[in-house]
UniProtKB/Swiss-Prot annotation:
GO molecular function, one term: DNA binding
Gene Ontology CC annotation, any one: cytoplasm
Signal peptide region: none
Keywords: Cytoplasm, Stress response
Gene: hspQ
Biological process annotations from GO: response to heat
InterPro entries (alphabetical): Hemimethylated_DNA-bd_dom, Hemimethylated_DNA-bd_sf, HspQ
Main location class: cytoplasm
Protein name: Heat shock protein HspQ
Segments passing through the bilayer: none
Family: Belongs to the HspQ family.
């Protein structure tokens, strides 16, 4: 059984880049057909660990869809007023998460 550190709708932060984001889906292991260099560079995490689909905001506040290993993420500790668009996205996903699982 795979145990995930983060849940769908949870706000997180990229450990290296510092970008905030929201988990929108979870794969129990790496599931993309062919990894791109950006997805695997600097990442020693085995492909058998959890991987997360995350919508992040770059340093200009623009949304970016990313696919990241659990080891690249940390829990978001900032105030909910720092990233209002991510707060709204997290709330919508959390409300719909029970529907998405069935």
């Amino acid at each position: 059984m795979i145990i995930c550190k983060f849940g769908i709708g949870q706000q997180i932060r990229h450990k290296l880049l510092g970008f905030p984001g929201v988990v929108i889906d979870i794969d129990p292991e790496y599931s993309l057909e062919t990894p791109t260099w950006e997805e695997i560079s600097g990442n020693d995490t085995p492909r058998s660990e959890p991987w997360y689909h995350v919508v992040m905001e770059d340093d200009e506040g623009q949304p970016i869809h990313t696919y990241l290993a659990e080891a690249q993420l940390m829990k978001e500790e900032l105030s909910e007023h720092e990233h209002p668009s991510l707060n709204e996205l997290a709330e919508v996903i959390q409300r719909r998460a029970p529907q998405l699982r069935h």
